[in-house]
């Protein structure tokens, strides 16, 4: 429904209105909306109805009921008059809630409850993030106190276990040569180029019976040719 700004209905939005229905009931509430069929929406609405007595000697009595938000059908509406100006506390409902009591606190938006003169709390230097802009704090400032020594010791232990190269002091020579199957011991000449070194018994097994034939131990004569099969 297109309604002009000069409409009388729009001028009474948020007013306290008295609406009388065909059956005699009276609804008093804050006028919030309407449509082309004159269907009304009232909030904080109260209903007043007159109850007829059973005997003619008794007077009529009026009964009040608190309803809250009400949608009135336009086909039942008889009259509509202004009851009062808009309430000042439009953001607070007039309908009392059961067991609800107002507290001493004040509702405020986030970030507006701190006075202007109070400085904002800041994080410690070791826990603060980098500064926005060109640069930030140094590495010493960013490292938490009491953790640098432990981290350095853990890194050194990890490097030694992983087999990192050991630094030898100057003047004492380099590391000893690796011992392998093809490398001769210190002080002995290796085999000439093109020849494989002789195969000896496996390490950890002493020469004796059941071992493969190889070079005899030093100081012992080799057996005769016919006696080699008996050993």
From Swiss-Prot:
Heart, and less in brain, pituitary and liver. Disulfide bonds: none annotated. Coiled coil: none annotated. One of its GO terms (biological process) is mRNA splicing, via spliceosome. One of its GO terms (cellular component) is U5 snRNP. It is found in: Cytoplasm, Cytosol; Nucleus. Residues 175-228 are annotated as: Repeat-rich region. Sequence repeats lie at residues 175-181, 191-196, 216-221, 222-228. Residues 4-86 form the Sm domain. It comes from the Eukaryota. The modification Dimethylated arginine is found at residues 108, 112. InterPro entries: LSM_dom_sf, Sm, Sm_dom_euk/arc, snRNP-assoc_SmB/SmN. It holds the Pfam family LSM. The modification Asymmetric dimethylarginine is found at residues 108, 112. The keyword RNA-binding applies. Keywords: Cytoplasm, Methylation, mRNA processing, mRNA splicing, Nucleus, Repeat, Ribonucleoprotein, RNA-binding, Spliceosome. Residues 172-205, 214-231 have a biased composition (Pro residues). Methylated by PRMT5. Arg-108 and Arg-112 are dimethylated, probably to asymmetric dimethylarginine. Its main location: cytoplasm. Plays a role in pre-mRNA splicing as a core component of the spliceosomal U1, U2, U4 and U5 small nuclear ribonucleoproteins (snRNPs), the building blocks of the spliceosome. Component of both the pre-catalytic spliceosome B complex and activated spliceosome C complexes. As a component of the minor spliceosome, involved in the splicing of U12-type introns in pre-mRNAs. As part of the U7 snRNP it is involved in histone pre-mRNA 3'-end processing. Core component of the spliceosomal U1, U2, U4 and U5 small nuclear ribonucleoproteins (snRNPs), the building blocks of the spliceosome. Most spliceosomal snRNPs contain a common set of Sm proteins, SNRPB, SNRPD1, SNRPD2, SNRPD3, SNRPE, SNRPF and SNRPG that assemble in a heptameric protein ring on the Sm site of the small nuclear RNA to form the core snRNP. Component of the U1 snRNP. The U1 snRNP is composed of the U1 snRNA and the 7 core Sm proteins SNRPB, SNRPD1, SNRPD2, SNRPD3, SNRPE, SNRPF and SNRPG, and at least three U1 snRNP-specific proteins SNRNP70/U1-70K, SNRPA/U1-A and SNRPC/U1-C. Belongs to the snRNP SmB/SmN family. This is Small nuclear ribonucleoprotein-associated protein B. It comes from Rattus norvegicus (Rat).
């Amino acid at each position: 429904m297109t309604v002009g700004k000069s409409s009388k209905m729009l001028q009474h939005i948020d007013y306290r209105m008295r609406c009388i229905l065909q059956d005699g009931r009276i609804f008093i509430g804050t006028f919030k909306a309407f449509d082309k069929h004159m269907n009304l929406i009232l909030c904080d609405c109260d209903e007043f109805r007159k109850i007829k007595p059973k005997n003619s000697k008794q007077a009529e009595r009026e009964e009040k009921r608190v309803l809250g938000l009400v949608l009135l059908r336009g086909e039942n509406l008889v009259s509509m008059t202004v009851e009062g100006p808009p309430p000042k506390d439009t953001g607070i409902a007039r309908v009392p809630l059961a067991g609800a009591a107002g507290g001493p606190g004040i509702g405020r938006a986030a970030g507006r409850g701190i006075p202007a003169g109070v400085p904002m709390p800041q994080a410690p230097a070791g826990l603060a993030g980098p500064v926005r802009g060109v640069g930030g704090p140094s590495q010493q400032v960013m490292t938490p106190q009491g953790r640098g020594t432990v981290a350095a010791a853990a890194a050194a232990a990890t490097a030694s276990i992983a087999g990192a190269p050991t630094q030898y002091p100057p003047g004492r020579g380099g590391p000893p040569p690796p011992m392998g199957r093809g490398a001769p011991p210190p002080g002995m000449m290796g085999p000439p180029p093109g020849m494989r070194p002789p195969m000896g018994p496996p390490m950890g097994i002493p020469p004796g019976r059941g071992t493969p034939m190889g070079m005899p131990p030093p100081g012992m004569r080799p057996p005769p040719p016919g006696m080699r099969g008996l050993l």
